[in-house]
Amino acid sequence: MMMVMQPEGLGAGEGRFAGGGGGGEYMEQEEDWDRDLLLDPAWEKQQRKTFTAWCNSHLRKAGTQIENIEEDFRNGLKLMLLLEVISGERLPRPDKGKMRFHKIANVNKALDFIASKGVKLVSIGAEEIVDGNLKMTLGMIWTIILRFAIQDISVEETSAKEGLLLWCQRKTAPYRNVNVQNFHTSWKDGLALCALIHRHRPDLIDYAKLRKDDPIGNLNTAFEVAEKYLDIPKMLDAEDIVNTPKPDEKAIMTYVSCFYHAFAGAEQAETAANRICKVLAVNQENEKLMEEYEKLASELLEWIRRTVPWLENRVGEPSMSAMQRKLEDFRDYRRLHKPPRIQEKCQLEINFNTLQTKLRLSHRPAFMPSEGKLVSDIANAWRGLEQVEKGYEDWLLSEIRRLQRLQHLAEKFRQKASLHEAWTRGKEEMLSQRDYDSALLQEVRALLRRHEAFESDLAAHQDRVEHIAALAQELNELDYHEAASVNSRCQAICDQWDNLGTLTQKRRDALERMEKLLETIDRLQLEFARRAAPFNNWLDGAVEDLQDVWLVHSVEETQSLLTAHDQFKATLPEADRERGAIMGIQGEIQKICQTYGLRPCSTNPYITLSPQDINTKWDMVRKLVPSCDQTLQEELARQQVNERLRRQFAAQANAIGPWIQAKVEEVGRLAAGLAGSLEEQMAGLRQQEQNIINYKTNIDRLEGDHQLLQESLVFDNKHTVYSMEHIRVGWEQLLTSIARTINEVENQVLTRDAKGLSQEQLNEFRASFNHFDRKQNGMMEPDDFRACLISMGYDLGEVEFARIMTMVDPNAAGVVTFQAFIDFMTRETAETDTTEQVVASFKILAGDKNYITPEELRRELPAKQAEYCIRRMVPYKGSGAPAGALDYVAFSSALYGESDL
């Protein structure tokens, strides 16, 4: 039976009986009812019919019924049977005789049973019931109805009558033309009864088609539907109710109480179904979050798996253009492809933390991602990616520098090789001549002196040949892609140089043999040769230096070249005086030859170099000097532009770097100790996040300056300690830090709302947490957490502390976050669903059976939730169950992680 408050103001029989606990009003109303019975036969008729139907609705459970209420209860047998059915208890054994005293004994047993239930019977005796007194019989039945059908009805601590009336008012409140104020006139038009049925079973009555001006039709509709579908027998006549100015209150209450008991079970089932739906909705939402996490983690890990081999590829390119394309591809990767993945990684951590918080709040087991997809696994993969990425960028820059130097060395090798090949051209043929065989003494001496001058020139070229060989060696060491042609050319030069040395030595030996025969020599020609050869060598060196190719990286290096060039120009007057002196010697030679008509006047036997050659080279030097001036000034201008780019980048980087560091520290301080309410903290963090987002334009501007530097092949900057990589890493760290802090506050709001915490409680928890957070990093280590618990009065042994650590650190990370700390401290006060509650709810739907059928699930739950349960429940293995029965106990345990689905 329903456990509700006993009714007030209901009783039977002119003060002769009253329900135990009904009070004075109970008796007063019954006295009014008795007097009305004497005056209004219509009420007697209604009560007789209603009470007879009510008794039969219970007696039919025992396989019997009554026809005449005052006659069929006279022997007391059916009266005792009625009491046994409605109370569920056994009465004393009835007397089997048919004598009057046997009947009186049976009726007394029934009345004694009623009195044992706390009901006082006044002036109702067994003799009156045995004699068929209708008034006393109706009063006795009404007393039974009050005690066993109405007394237990209670809504919000009201009496039985008021509780039943309040229940009717609430259920019919939304319906038009229905205003239940009592148990007589409010029910005459039949709409109130139809509204009660429609409220609980809208499929049985089309309320919109009912008319207030058809009370008999409405009443008959309600009676027929109740009898056919709700198992409530017809206890009233529509015509009697409509034609009576004030229908009998007791009859109406008796009939309406049947509706209350019929629908009470349905409401209980509805409550159980709602509880199950709520639990299943939470479980399905968590499963969806788990699937989203797995999907995001798989996609991110797959992208890292595909990207790492590309970054690990260290196969260089032979040309600068190809390496520049590789560098541009890397820039596109950093600018276009990596930032969205950073956002995905951050969102993945946020989703993981939110899911774990929801699981803890709903007392579900902590989410453990599939193998290789833990947050730590993703973090390790990401660190590996960034390590490879840093190595790849360093390799690119070093490879570009290598190719740049290779280009410079190759150009320098070609220039020096060309100059040397031009110098050696014809030298082998010259050294192989035997012109001294028919020469005069003076000619031989001249040939010898000329050969000495050549040897001097040859010795001067030794450094150039060694420099050419050193350049070739360096090109080979730097893996120059045309090293084969360089080696071939260098080998040819070295072989030719060795041959020149051999030929030179052979010619000297021949001339020295001839020198003993030839004595005459022209000292002036010799002097010309001796002075002209070094000067010519100086001219060759000057031309070579003026035509040299420079590779500089700074204004200072360019200034150094300009200084050296100015020093060279300062030596030109002295060189011009030397040239004049040499030309003077040649003039003196010509004068002497002309004076004496000597044969050697047309040529100098000691040197092949003519004065015209010296003048030509001198003119070339004078022409190359301004050209070199212009080239150096252009290089100085280019280096000054690069210097401005360096300073421009440094000015921004020196402002952005400290700003990012300050913001990172500020966010760290906010995460460690926030003040104000969580909403105020969230607003402050959102403002910080917006300020950071607004600052992104400065990062983009710095990226543009960095790209200009790289396009200008500027790779160093002494004006700042912040590289673009430092700025990028700091910016990414700042974005991750503010997102993680916002997520932590959001989870605190979720915890506060779910567990009803006040702001003062949260501040108290935060103060305790910060006190024991020795590293001030937002996480307590196990020893700190244990010290915190002991300071708060916990008596912890090793086993108990290990159990608590399993609760607050389910993933065994070795730290306790503030969110896990709050969850533990508030776990005792949280109102949560449990496995036992869900099992009890399923048991109600199953009608107290230990199993449930698919049909019962589809009838009591929404279609989507019902199919979800049917798919997940395992078959029931107990005895006595029909085919297809499902085990809801195992299913409920699996929802809370106590077993496997």
Swiss-Prot record:
The UniProt entry's GO CC annotations, sorted and at most eight, read:
actin filament; brush border; cell junction; cell projection; cortical actin cytoskeleton; cytosol; extracellular exosome; focal adhesion
The subunit field of the Swiss-Prot or TrEMBL record says:
Homodimer; antiparallel. Also forms heterodimers with ACTN2. Interacts with MYOZ1.
Positions binding Ca(2+) 1 in this chain are 773, 777, 779, 784
Query: So where does this one cross the membrane?
Result: none
Annotated GO biological processes are: actin cytoskeleton organization; bone morphogenesis; focal adhesion assembly; muscle cell development; negative regulation of calcineurin-NFAT signaling cascade; negative regulation of cold-induced thermogenesis; negative regulation of glycolytic process; negative regulation of oxidative phosphorylation
Which positions does UniProt annotate for Ca(2+) 2 binding? 809, 811
Spectrin repeat residue numbers: 288-398, 408-513, 523-634, 644-747
Q: What does this protein do?
A: F-actin cross-linking protein which is thought to anchor actin to a variety of intracellular structures. This is a bundling protein.
Per UniProt, which keywords does this protein have? Acetylation, Actin-binding, Calcium, Metal-binding, Repeat
Q: What is this protein called?
A: Alpha-actinin-3
Q: Where is the EF-hand domain?
A: 760-795, 796-831
Q: Which family does it belong to?
A: Belongs to the alpha-actinin family.
